[in-house]
């Protein structure tokens, strides 16, 4: 009942913001601090921040929170060093900024690559949404994915960035309130904080784990997350689009700082739920629907939720749904925006009217949602979906390396940038495919696709800029 009410409320808010939406308002225009924070936070607090981090909490402990902390550090990096530059350029998309630095050719290449990135990430959110509906409502996955996609697309098409900002305000509140309430109730139920820490310390002494250590998950994983977030935060269209739509530069910078502060702590709460699940599992009180003790971290959040009172359990479900909704909508909007601004308006119809752009924006946004849905249905049973998504994130971060060259080095040029971005895309995909086929990374176990993509971008941009030493006008 709580979930159905939440669905209806989300649609109503999205539809109410649709009245009189112009092309500029659809993509975002003159947003204030609160609107930017709520719209941007959705990019960083998706399904992985709930189910994924709770799984890390179950297995590794509180160090699983590094996932959202890394995202917060990335947004803070954007605030301190690039929010002012980006906003002063006055473009609505990352490819638009790349065009400002390198020219049209680089804009087209980057827009194609970043649209692919957005669609890959959007596909993962549709998979999460489909599985959510499958587990909660007993629907066939395909039906669940289609229904959720229709909901995402409907309210995003209705109000664009206005709808995303308005609905994400509600999503953000529900996520924090639902998860925080659950954490408090669960720890009190275990006998309070001292009893909780004592129980997990006993488990650690028996199993040789360190659930209360921030380093237990390992430096390679943490460093990979931090590097990907520092670079990716500066090229994440879904997270940056509200910033580019801010009313002025001080608003953009302030909103980024607040977004970082909102994003970073969330993983601490969901990791704690995973740790509670570990304690309950060791005590034999965390069981699945068949009565078997849960030992799989992937089931931690759902299984713990089933032990809560119905209303609180409904709030946690709503929080999980809010995390998915808050990410999926800005992602398909970002893909539609880049297709419209950086391909249609820049290449196909340079003199398009505002009415034409609004129409095309809605069509491309809807098509982005449909493509994500088809991809989700096709790949739901593929065990390598997360590898594909991480490859997309790595490519996004590597593109920022190319952009940095353009800001800081006079010899960086359009031809070098275009070829470098293509090479980086090929290397990123190859690195993931190699791991899928062989079960291990090329070169070294710690040399993930993040390092491979960044290294390729840095080296190829340096060499090619020296070879092609004239910047495109």
What are these regions (language model features)?
Residues 1-473:
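Membrane-embedded helix-loop-helix hairpins and adjacent transmembrane boundary segments
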